[in-house]
């Protein structure tokens, strides 16, 4: 299919120094630094890139038939394997009715996640490549916890499920009044959420509070799409409601922690006014 499992070692073997890629990354880093300071340059550059990428994707989408038994998964735009997409994927692997389905994971660095290929029905594509766009055009379902790429739109027979990745205690999208975001103005942020809201079929909310915030953040009431919000909870949280003492013991053992202590997890969110080229928001 998109990735020949038999050639994993060859595909990801050490390669000679790629000077063209290094030059591209240097130019990209330079452009990002300019974009932070010059909003006009940033907006015009993004507009040109979006139009070009959308035209290219539309050509792929128009010639590929949707496959009802192909599902595309992505976590944080391909940066990791986890959260609710992982929970849904791993649940589906245990269900006989999905034995003839094909699962495709999109990653930015596939080499880190080749373990998913242990399942014979699972494949990998690299985000923002032609293979990724072919997978998106083919899959009946898109299961994401972050916004889908702006230039990729679903066909009428495709279902984009927006799982998001948390409760919006911090303002999102249209709820942002003043933006100190390092890479986007308030209007640019709203445009991104506007595009996403026009694409997803469903967005899952973990609570009534979250459901209300999603409606306002994506401006769903104004566009008549409040019915897309499903207050069903996050699949990733099922484990927290059903864990056993053995699960706790396994975690403590794996992290090599003392078993006679109580633990507090501090997990601060990202800061949208801090952005480092090559890394992202920090």
Please place each PLM-identified region on the residue numbering:
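Exposed alpha-helical structural elements
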Residues: 22, 112, 131, 246-250
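Active-site and donor-binding regions of nucleotide-sugar-utilizing enzymes
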Residues: 70-242
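Conserved catalytic-core segment of nucleotide-activated headgroup transferases in glycan assembly
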Residues: 80-91, 217, 234-282
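A short, charged/proline- and glycine-enriched loop
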Residues: 63-72, 157, 259-262
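Acidic/glycine-enriched edge-of-secondary-structure segments
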Residues: 37-49, 73-77, 235-239, 272-273
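Basic, ligand-binding patches in group-transfer machinery
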Residues: 1-70, 94
């Amino acid at each position: 299919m998109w990735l020949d499992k038999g050639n994993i070692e060859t595909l990801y073997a050490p390669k000679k120094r790629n000077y063209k890629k290094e030059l591209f990354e240097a130019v990209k880093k330079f452009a990002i630094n300019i974009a932070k300071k010059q909003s006009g340059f940033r907006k015009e550059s993004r507009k040109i890139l979006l139009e070009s990428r959308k035209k290219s994707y539309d050509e792929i989408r128009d010639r590929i038939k949707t496959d009802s038994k192909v599902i595309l998964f992505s976590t944080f735009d391909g940066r990791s394997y986890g959260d609710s997409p992982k929970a849904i994927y791993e649940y589906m692997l245990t269900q006989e009715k999905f034995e003839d389905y094909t699962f495709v994971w999109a990653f930015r660095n596939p080499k880190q996640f080749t373990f998913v290929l242990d399942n014979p029905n699972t494949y990998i594509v690299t985000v923002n490549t032609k293979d990724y766009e072919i997978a998106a055009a083919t899959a009946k379902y898109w299961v994401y916890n972050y916004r889908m790429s702006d230039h990729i739109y679903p066909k009428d027979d495709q279902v984009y499920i927006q799982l998001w990745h948390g409760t919006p205690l911090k303002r999102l999208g249209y709820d942002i009044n003043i933006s100190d975001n390092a890479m986007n103005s308030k209007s640019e942020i709203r445009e991104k959420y506007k595009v996403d809201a026009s694409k997803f079929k469903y967005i899952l909310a973990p609570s009534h509070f979250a459901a209300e915030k999603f409606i306002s953040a994506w401006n769903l009431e104004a566009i008549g799409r409040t019915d897309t919000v499903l207050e069903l909870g996050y699949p990733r949280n099922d484990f927290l409601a059903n864990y056993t003492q053995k699960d706790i013991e396994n975690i403590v053992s794996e992290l090599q922690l003392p078993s006679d202590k109580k633990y507090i997890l501090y997990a601060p969110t990202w800061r949208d006014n801090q952005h480092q080229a090559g890394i992202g928001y920090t």
